[in-house]
Each structure stands twice: as C-alpha cells, then as structure tokens.
Amino acid sequence: MRHGRRWWLLLGLLGALAMAPRAAEAQEFDLGAGADYWTQSPGMGIFSFGLDALWRVAPGIQLGFKPGFFLTTSGDVPAGIPLDFKVRVNVSSVYVDGFIGPWFFFKGDVARIHVGMGAGLRLGRLLLGGEVSYLNNGATFGGRIGFQL
C-alpha cells in the first residue's frame, strides 16, 4: 500500500470515529410546557417551560435533568429557574417520571426543594401527561405537554 493511500485510510477512519455516537451525548431532548396549581397559601398557578436531556442507562430506563423557566400568578413570587434531576421509565407508549431538584426563585426564599412524579403517553413525538409534586410548603398538581426534538 502506498503512503498516500494510508493517509486517506487513516483520515477516513478518524472521520468515521468523529461521527459515531458518543455515550456522553444526550440521547433524547424533550421541549415542554406545563401548568400547575400550587396549594401554598392562598394557592397560585405556575406556568413552566423546560428542556429535558435524557440518557438511556438500561432498556426502558433513562436518567437526565430538566432546566427551565417558570412564571407564577403571584406578585410575591413572580418567576424562577427550576433544575430537576429525573429518572424516566418507558413501557411501550407510557412513561413514568420521578424527579427531585432545587427551584430557584427570583424573590422570597431563593432555593426551594421540588420532589414528585409524573406519568403520560408518548404519541409519536408528542408527550401528554400529568404531574404531582411537593414544592416547599405545598403540593402541585398539573398537566404537561412536550415535543421530542
């Protein structure tokens, strides 16, 4: 084999390796929105927007995180940034999520714990579901809609 051919073979091999999927890359991204009722006195609405980044760790099981942004219907606590770590179990077209993480508020108690679970249906690239969680001094109940990117 001539020296020039070896060079092209090596270059082709490096190109194929560069384009191969890497284990460190997220395998699924979901862009979503939600609306919740928060029972903290006197009760308020929360509208959230987030991007799930998920990695498959076993068949039907994914781990990931969900950064985002939220707005509330209260002037006392107007907005913030949620950062949930999550586990998702997929069974056919049904998914179940468990999550925990800090929510950072722009006013008042800056960091609050968020723990909960959700479930829903995967209809092609569309995800429809619900969620129940605990956020600091009250429960949240709401719906979710998402789109797999």
Description of each model-found segment:
Residues R6-W7, Y37, L54, P102:
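Residues in intrinsically disordered, low-complexity segments of regulatory proteins
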